Amino acid sequence: MGQPRFSRPVHPAAAAEEVDHPPSDAGMGVDVLESGDTTPPTKRKSKFSGFGKIFKPWKWRKKKSSDKFKETSEVLERKISMRKPREELVKRGVLLEDPEQALSSDCPGKEGSVLRKSIILISHFRDAETPGQSEDDGGRLLYLQFQNLLLREGKEAAWPWHQAECIPVEQQVPPLGIKLTRGLFPSAGKSQGRAAEHPGLGLTSCVLLSTSILSAPANVSAGAFLVSFLSLVCNCSEALRAPGGEAVTLLTDTXEVTNQAQPPCQTAPCPPHPIPTNRNSSSVIAELSQAINSGTGLSKPSPPLPPKRGLLPTNPPEAALPSKPPGDRTVTASRPTLLPMHVAPTYPPPSPSPPLPTHIPPEPPRMPLPNSTPALDAPRSLDLPKETPPPSKDFRSLEVSKRTAEQGFGEPPGLPRLPQIPLHIRIQQALASPLPVTPPADGSHRAHSLLFENDGFGEDNGTLGRTRSLPVTIEMLKVPDDEEEEEEDQEEEQNSGPRVYIGDVPSITVIPMLVPQVLPEEQEGEEGMSDSDSEGPILYKDDEEDEEEDESHNSTLANKVKRKDTLAIKLGNTTTVQEEKIVFPRKSKEEWNEIRQQIGTTLIRRLSQRPTAEELEQRNILQPKNEADRQAEKREIKRRLTRKLSQRPTVAELQARKILRFNEYVEVTDAQDYDRRADKPWTKLTPADKAAIRKELNEFKSCEMEVHEESKQFTRYHRP
């Protein structure tokens, strides 16, 4: 069973510590993994221990450790106890032989040249280990192939497998004439600590390759060195398997990329990239792809982050992108390019929403809305097609995106046309107008309508399709059946006094109408009465009475005016109405007899359904009529009772028959007859009354029942 090989940064202090302390797993504490010291630490009394007394239901209990946690800790402890000693690890090349020498960066004349010992950790998993193959055969094979690749390029390998001496800068320059800048691998050092080891997944071997990354003044692309190394990894990818059994392929078409002309890196040193937090076997690959972000388009980028809130993703035009050689263009057509860091990355928008335009059209000036005359603004919108006030920014951007998705950017968006307002809504707007209604100057009874009233639009704008002012005619409410009696009503209006015919002639009582006679238009015009001041009814008549006589115009304004005037007249005439006597119309004797007969038959029919007197007496509903009869009934009842009582045996007879037994000391005395009824019924007893009754019973049983001394233990007392 192959043991996992742990690789760590080549700092000597850290390496010395890691020999004694193994790496801890992601979810476990370090003290669990220590096999030597298993005693738990002493528990101190917490300063918040008093909270448990306050919050009684929620006690602070220690969580039980799960069985899975215990099993994994036991497995780890067993594996740690089977660790190889330090000398064997040094022989295999996992650890450096002399870690103190690795710290010395004071080479003659090259102070500060060594930046970092970069560790590239390539962990691979095998489905089944080949028998006869040692644990580090894969690592040796990988190193030998890398050494052969460097020799084929014409350079000797500048860094040995075990050595960490300070090598001169000329020998440490990587092959293919590459100068590595300082900011090339910013995340290499961080990734050393983040490489997650999974001991239970069959990790068989690791390759530890330490390379010295040096700072050099020349601006040469770093892609060729990585290509040469990664092509070596791709050659060995048949032996390298992922945990699921899939081959780890770092890059495809490596030979095609190596043939390209590498352009010099023209961008500034990149800032450190964020390190991916997922701890899987592809973390190193993601870091390698991030390291060559600035100059090359070799690897696939990680999925794009969502854009920050409030920023619009702007697609840079194609002309603004840096020009590439034709070899690069063939690669970028098949793979997405990695832009330099100073260029904002273009995030692909979600598929259902259309792309937002980069240029928002300027906002048209907002027109102030007059609040004083809402009734006058409504008809203006009918006459002239105005521009609607601009919507809010969010709504406008949504509308712009919708229009651009439908008709493109070239076509101007059409102005929305206002719908025609129906007539009844315009009438309601005119009636709800806060402006005072002024009568026309000609004195006619025509309702002054504000429907098509305008301030600045007169007859000049007649060509714009304006209609003339709509006359609203208001008449009194009229029932069609009353047209025949119109003449009689007019005569009755003239003689408004009540008329009663005395005698055998049937009398007709005329109740006066509450509406006085209407003045003609000419007389009202001479007297100068206004519509609001006139006490009579306001009868608005149109000039064309004959045509509109059949139609009754019952609008809300007519009902309002009619209600107001009739209420005022009624309130003024209340006293006269109360003083008038209600006179019933006289009828003949025959009619009265018929009415009486009808009432009698209905009463007889209803009375026949009533129970008789005998039935009511049997039900004890109807009492006997006379008081003497009641007294006689009482006497009869008393006589029956006395006869029954007289037939009772006497006390002597009962003693002789030994039914009654009297002791000698018992005295029979005559007691006064008293009322045995309680003060109140038992249903209305309060708790205090019940307590008093219980107390009285207990006192009686304890004091006055001395006769039953023998059975006193059986006496049942009531609770107090």
Curated annotation (Swiss-Prot):
Region described as Disordered: 1-48, 294-417, 454-568, 610-648
Keyword Repeat found: yes
Key words, A-Z: Actin-binding, Cell projection, Cytoplasm, Developmental protein, Neurogenesis, Repeat
Biased composition (Acidic residues): 481-494, 521-534, 542-551
InterPro entries per record: RPEL_repeat
A cellular component term, taken from the record's GO annotations: cytoplasm
MF-aspect GO terms: actin binding; protein phosphatase 1 binding; protein phosphatase activator activity
Spans of repeat RPEL: 74-99, 601-626, 639-664
Main subcellular location: cytoplasm
PROSITE patterns named among the record's database cross-references: RPEL
Cellular localization per UniProt: Cytoplasm; Cell projection, Lamellipodium
UniProt family annotation: Belongs to the phosphatase and actin regulator family.
PANTHER family: PHOSPHATASE AND ACTIN REGULATOR 4, PHOSPHATASE AND ACTIN REGULATOR PHACTR
Function text: Regulator of protein phosphatase 1 (PP1) required for neural tube and optic fissure closure, and enteric neural crest cell (ENCCs) migration during development. Acts as an activator of PP1. During neural tube closure, localizes to the ventral neural tube and activates PP1, leading to down-regulate cell proliferation within cranial neural tissue and the neural retina. Also acts as a regulator of migration of enteric neural crest cells (ENCCs) by activating PP1, leading to repression of the integrin signaling through the RHO/ROCK pathway.
UniProt subunit comment: Binds PPP1CA and actin.
This protein's name: Phosphatase and actin regulator 4
Record organism: Gallus gallus (Chicken)
